[in-house]
Amino acid sequence: MNKILESIRGKLIVSCQALEDEPLHSSFIMGRMAYAAYSGGAAGIRANTVEDIKEIKKNVSLPIIGIIKKVYNNSDVYITPTIKEVEDLINEGVQIIAIDATKRERPDRKDLKNFIAEIKEKYPNQLFMADISSVDEALYAEKIGFDIVGTTLVGYTDYTKNYKALEELKKVVKVVKIPVIAEGNIDTPLKAKKALEIGAFAVVVGGAITRPQQITKKFVDEMK
C-alpha cells in the first residue's frame, strides 16, 4: 500500500478550515490550528486554499488532503471543481487532492470520468480522493480511477439531504475496495471510533475540533 495511505490508516485527520465569513479566517491561524491538531495526535490535515496550505506546511509535516473551495455561478460543485484548482494544489505538493465526485454538473461541463482520466494521465503519481454523497457515487468513483472515497458530502446534496453519514458509510464500505475515509457530521470521539468499527480507513473531523463558534453554540443550546 502507498506509504501516505499507510500513515493515516485507522487514524484521525483534522480539517483545519475557516471560510471568509468565519471568526478564525486567517492562514496564520490555520497554521497554528494544524500544529495544535498535530500536538493532540492527528495523523493528517485537510486544508482549503493554497495560502492556508503554505502556512500549515510551515508548522507541521503531516500528510495534507488539499482542496480549493471555489464557487462558480453555473454549478453547485465547489470542492476543487476544475483543472485550475487541481493544478494549484499539485504545485503546492499536497499528498492527497480531494475533488467533488458527486453526479452534479461541473462548472467546466466536463464529465467526471473524463475529468479524472485527464488529471490522472497528467499526474499519475498523485493520490485523488472522491468526495461523494451516496453509495452509487462511491462505486462510480472507484470504477473511474479515484484512489480514495470520502463520505464528505453525504447530506449536502439535494438528493441526500435526509441521509445519515454513518449509515451511508456502512453501505459504502461494503461495496468498494479502495480506502473509505469517513467525513462529515462526525462531531464526537464516539462517532469517530464508531466510523472505524464500521470499516472506515481513517476519519476526518473538522468543526467539532476547529470551529470554536460551533462548539460554543452547542454548549449554549444545551444550557437553554
Swiss-Prot record:
The protein's Enzyme Commission number: 5.1.3.9
Annotated GO CC locations: cytosol
Pfam families recorded: NanE (PF04131)
Catalytic activity: an N-acyl-D-glucosamine 6-phosphate = an N-acyl-D-mannosamine 6-phosphate
CDD domains hit by this protein: NanE
GO BP: carbohydrate metabolic process; N-acetylmannosamine catabolic process; N-acetylneuraminate catabolic process
Family: Belongs to the NanE family.
Task performed by this protein: Converts N-acetylmannosamine-6-phosphate (ManNAc-6-P) to N-acetylglucosamine-6-phosphate (GlcNAc-6-P).
Protein name stated in the entry: Putative N-acetylmannosamine-6-phosphate 2-epimerase
Designated gene of the protein: nanE
